[in-house]
Amino acid sequence: MLKLSGISAGYGGFQALFDVSLEVNAGETVAVIGPNGAGKTTLLRVISKLIDATAGELAMETHRLNDVPSHAVIGYGIAHVPENRRLFPRLSVEENLRMGSYVPAARAKFAERLEQVYALFPRMRERRKQLAGTLSGGEQQMCAIGRALMSGPKLLLLDEPSAGLAPVVVQAIFDVVRRMSAEGYTVLIVEQNVQQVLKVADRAYLLETGRIKLEGRAAELRENEAIKKAYLGL
């Protein structure tokens, strides 16, 4: 579905990614793990065209995306949930969710997808009239993911969904990712909580200093000695 081949990218004179290649197949949950500053967020920003790659090829299904502007990426079925969520704090939960269905094809299925989001996040149904800015951190993350799902994406990009959340809330967020995987959603998730994300992912890539250092089945990486020592505290 998604294929990156030899992607390099950066900001100004700083290069953040070096010759990165990865794939996400339909129905997979794929994790990108690594330390702070490894280039994980930059990778998602390249995919959603918030920044341009300086080298390499980016493709979604049969479409080359290198020259596609950022506002058009949603038309190719890619939805991005950024690390800071970027909700509209003075709008209600349901109004925020409605913002995710702004493209014509999504507007036509608003009611159906709203019910799907409420089924996935029952708390959002309870809070639907509440201002998004008054939600807890975990509830805001659920709302942000729900808003992205309202577009009916083929691929969901999640940037550090557990960042800044209490452990019990982190578990709830990963339970949602697990449910999305079971329901056939395709997810590319960037995450520093390696122990949790390798439990829900099918495959994973280790990104360090802007380069892919390891890749494989998530279950295999959980048993990798270097991963255990550096990221799992074992």
Specify the residue positions occupied by each region the protein language model found.
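ABC-type ATPase nucleotide-binding domains, specifically the catalytic core motifs of the NBD
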Residues: G12, V68, V93-E112, L120-R125, ...
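The feature captures the beta-strand-to-loop junction immediately N-terminal to the Walker
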Residues: I33-P35
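Helix-to-loop junction immediately C-terminal to a conserved catalytic motif
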Residues: S48
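Conserved ABC transporter NBD signature motif
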Residues: G56-R64, Y76, K109-L114, G216
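Conserved ABC ATPase signature
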Residues: L131-L135, E139
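ABC ATPase C-loop
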Residues: A148-L149
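Catalytic Walker B motif of ABC-type/P-loop ATPase nucleotide-binding domains
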Residues: L156-E160
